[in-house]
Amino acid sequence: MHIDRIELYLVENRFHKPWRTAYGSDPGNCAVFARMISGDKEGWSEASPLPGPNYSCEYGAGAFDVAKRFLAPSVIGRDFSSAKELNAAMSHVKGNPFAKSAIEMAWWCLDAYVKGKSLGALLGREKDEVDVGDGWGVYDSYDELIENIGKSLDMGYKRVKLKTMHGWDVEMLEAVRSVFPNETIHIDCNSSYTIDEIDIFKKMDKFHLAMIEQPFQNLDIYYHSKLQKQIETPLCLDETITEVWQAEQAAELGACGFINIKPARMYKE
């Protein structure tokens, strides 16, 4: 498939309320949209890093710049028969998975249009429907959080993810479980704790959470494995896993029971 043209757009989206997590407070997010054109067909994609480099080293304006200056020129005017070939053409750029995903996912969308298939069919879809969860950040009061959780459940969401941080963890979960004792709840720590705070997570076993996501720093596998051996609640790795080999190491070390897979975070050098 010949790539005739790529158009890139950087869009800033404002939230109704700032999104508060262990990383801080974000007033909105950034989206890098890519439009890839081949003949009379086109494919669109979206990669959404945060406005600043706090979740990862990438951020909105930076990902847009890398995609525009280094990645798009590497593929425009060339023919690719697979995503593997496309990624090989971008391999001179190290890392930057969000920027690369904007280009690659546009290619997948375009390839689906050209072949007349759904994207799900191309990716080997096994289900037509999946359960959707909702998520809430840090608030000024437990009552406000509990009210929002109730709204999510009333709307039919099957699970709810809660952001946590120092001062908004065990007591917060006590308050939530006093109102929602049996609902599927899990938490996301956004790398805000250390191995010296294992006792905090031992206290969380009584809440029967579905999982605890990314308690330790984003490059760590070893300390997550030590924590997992001392608690009953499954861990989930997010920022730590960017490539397949890291997932393999995490599995071998018993570092987690789940992996949060964000397509824009994953890449292969």
Q: Which stretches of residues belong to each language-model region?
A:
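N-terminal capping/lid subdomain adjacent to the active-site entrance of alpha/beta enzymes
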Residues: H2-I185, S192-I195, K203-K206, Q230
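Catalytic core of soluble alpha/beta enzymes
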Residues: L162, G167-E269
